[in-house]
Amino acid sequence: MAAITAALIKQVREETGAGMMDVKKALTEADGDVARAKEIIRAKGIQAAGKREGRKAQEGTIASTVIDSAAGQTGYAVELNSETDFVAKTPKFIDFADTVLADAVKAGADDIDAVLAAPSQDGTVKEAVEEASALFGEHVKVGQFAKIEGPKVEIYAHKKSVEMPPSIVAMIATDEAGAAVAHEAALQISAMGAQWLTRDDVPEDVVETERRVATEKSLAEGKPEKIVPKIVEGRLNAFFKENVLLEQAYVKDPSKTIGDLFKEVGGQALAFARLEVGKAPEADA
């Protein structure tokens, strides 16, 4: 039997990210053959990954990029989740997030399903993520994905602390003139979390729910029925100002709205997206 040296263990650990005992067992089973040991770790790891899927993965990072495209520019952002911030801030995890992003861009993915189905090395992104769960020893998953297009796309990536990778990414697509204030708009999206670009983008069922709640609240407060409609409209406008990007007060100068910024440069905001780690609809999975 070949000697299992510290150098061999170190080599396999660096190449796989697996724990010391897992590496030692794999090398022993493989009789010191590094390639075979890596195969064993991969095979056993994928089996272990299935057991991890029920564990919560709400930490992680967001990888993002802008590329030139037929539309002018296209912005991509992918959230990769782990269970702990300890794993999320490791160079290997951050590099893997960048790899998933690159695979998504190369495949021209439009949604998470397309990201997971995208080719990646010897298989798909889905398979690579399963292997990553084994290598990092945690449940790893693709949490969110966003893609926007326009003549110009601006991205702002926010870090909660200098040692952590980005936890919020804001992307905004504008026309050429609007690019002059796109960075400020992206900062606003990151900080204030707008949900829609214009009030026309707010789904009718959401508006009706807000209208109903505002009406019931006004009546419960004992407001005279004849002035309730006016109060309701005021509360609806407040809802729009809080949740519609172009109607939000500019955080650096509340006397202006984000819409005013674009008017000042004669530009337009066309679309935006905001991803925050752990905030996917299925983030509790």
From Swiss-Prot:
Stretches for region Involved in Mg(2+) ion dislocation from EF-Tu: 84-87
Principal subcellular localisation of the protein: cytoplasm
Compartments (UniProt record): Cytoplasm
Pfam families: EF_TS (PF00889)
Keyword Protein biosynthesis: yes
CC terms in the record's Gene Ontology section: cytoplasm
SUPFAM superfamilies noted in UniProt: Elongation factor Ts (EF-Ts), dimerisation domain, UBA-like
Keyword list, A-Z: Cytoplasm, Elongation factor, Protein biosynthesis
Example GO molecular function: translation elongation factor activity
UniProt cross-references to HAMAP family, sorted A to Z: EF_Ts
Protein role: Associates with the EF-Tu.GDP complex and induces the exchange of GDP to GTP. It remains bound to the aminoacyl-tRNA.EF-Tu.GTP complex up to the GTP hydrolysis stage on the ribosome.
Family (UniProt): Belongs to the EF-Ts family.
Protein name per the record: Elongation factor Ts
